[in-house]
Amino acid sequence: MMTMSDFPPTLTSLYQDQVEFQKLLGNTDIPKDDPNEMAHHLLGLVTEVGEVSQADKRWKKNKRNKHYNFQEKLDEIADCFIFLLNVCIYSDITPWQILNAIDRKINENKRRFKSPEKDEEQK
């Protein structure tokens, strides 16, 4: 028999956990649209993206860079998602809104890939 702990967390539960954590840091009036806080977390996201590339240097063109640490890369990608959650929280974007936007954009990208000529005609 499966229990709740057998299922991965949902975006909504992760979002709520991150809101709780931000409140522990003293940001009690959230979620809300706060451009300054959003900008702070965007900068943090850029930093974390750089750390992903440091955890897996196989993307570099020279053959000397073979560094790859799966767990480190996984943790840095998780940090990126956390910063993206914060960007949503400080943009007053709900989990439902972001999931629907992601779904819409994926479908739009698939449509464009399947029919690139139609996309060019619309420009």
Stretches found by the model and what they are:
Residues 1-123:
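Flexible "arm" and connector segments at domain edges
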